[in-house]
Amino acid sequence: MLRHNTTNDGVVALIVPGIGNSGPGHWQTLWEERHPGWQRVQQRDWDRPVCAEWLRGLDAAMARLSAPPVLIAHSMGCLLVAHWAKRSSLPVRAPFLVAAPDPAGPMFPP
């Protein structure tokens, strides 16, 4: 039987949404509600991503954490984590990347 773990078990997790900040019914938001100790990256503008600004938002969130986190990223958040990992020496427990967009695709923002 598969059971859902509703405790944090000491896991530090950081939710990294994509464009729109994963609204109320989104799986990232539901997971955050189930795990009140988890944190979420904050961005100034969730609808117009600017790589340098979003990297600063991720840096700020990482600075608040007590241990290397599981980075739970969705969509544009996956690309943010990839860019951040190239330039950061901070450790992470694991990346959990879901539905990374194709930057060469027609739906990708300019």
Where are these predicted regions, by residue range?
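Active-site catalytic motif of lipid deacylating hydrolases and related acyltransferases
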Residues: 2-3, 7-67
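Short helix-terminating capping/connector loops at secondary-structure junctions
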Residues: 9, 90-91
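Active-site nucleophile loop of the alpha/beta-hydrolase fold
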Residues: 18, 43-46, 96-105
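Flexible "cap/lid" loop of the alpha/beta hydrolase fold
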Residues: 51-54, 90, 97-110
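Residue in the alpha/beta-hydrolase core beta-strand immediately N-terminal to the catalytic nucleophile
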Residues: 70, 93-96
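Gly/Ala-rich beta-loop-alpha elbow adjacent to hydrolase catalytic centers
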Residues: 71-82
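Active-site signature of alpha/beta-hydrolase-fold catalytic machinery across serine-
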Residues: 83-87
